[in-house]
Amino acid sequence: MSEKRELILKYRNDVVNGKKLTRSTISELFNINNKFLLNLSDAANYITRHFHGSKVDIEELANIKKNFCSEDCTFCSQSAFFNTKITGYDLPPPEEIVEQALNAKNDGAGSFCLVAAWREPSILDFKKVCVIIEEINKKVGISVECSLGFLTDKQARTLKKLQVKRYNHNLETSRSKFPEICTTHTYDDRVKTLKIARNAGLELCTGGIIGLGETRKQREELILEISELEPEEVTVNMLVPMPGTPLELQTQLDITEILRVFSTLRFLLPKSIIKISGGREVNLKDDGQKLLLSGANGIISAGYLTMDGNAIKKDTEMINEINLEA
């Protein structure tokens, strides 16, 4: 056995035995030669099975307020800064979202995330979202998560009282790349909201988008920055270049770079859910199973914020084909 393979096995066993790896070790794993990527992937899968068994977490999203966002994130087709021809709408009546939540539960989703395209909720909109959450709790009984932009302490505490389990707020990219991606708020603004959510007792979901034109080093920075927040869930999106956005001509990442991210994340956060999110069908096509055997143990199914996705039935079949449990 080669020295590199032996090292991967050693680090795998260290993680299984509860040892936290150093930043230099993580860098060594993340930048390993392509010929050892399969070994890295297998080790990440071993860690996943050890801590999570064969269960794959399935989540559905509801885009409860679409388009016309005030922020200028260059990847986003919902930004008011860009002409993307995406049809927008404001908050729908609660019964519409309740019906979506019920369908998600009946489909087999374990959680249902309310997502809104705005910088932060207004007082009135936040009250409306709270009514939606209350109705879902009464009539559906599915785990509710939220992604509502920036939060105040009071809003975070209110969500906790409403039994919201987890709050999503992505870092989007590494600190060093962020100023190229967004100018209407800062990286620290995003970290602040995550800390507010944590202090209110909410679980955290954070992550980012890979393939924004960042370097491999910046992807490494991103996963280290994510791990410092110790989120219960990590969501990794792969850019789908959207017409009308500044990144519409961006080249997609090679599968080997995507594997690096998921596999190394598992060494960093062995007990967290690591979720394959937006861009899965476009970027991976039939390679989604590879990521579920390379550190990932969750997916978003049945569509995204402005794009269709696989039906849960199809995703469940995909999961079962590799002897995992949906």
What are these regions (language model features)?
Residues W118-S122, T193-Q218, V236-T251, S272-N283:
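Conserved strand-turn element in the central/C-terminal portion of the radical SAM core barrel
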Residues H50-N106:
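Active-site cofactor/substrate anionic-group-binding motifs, chiefly glycine-
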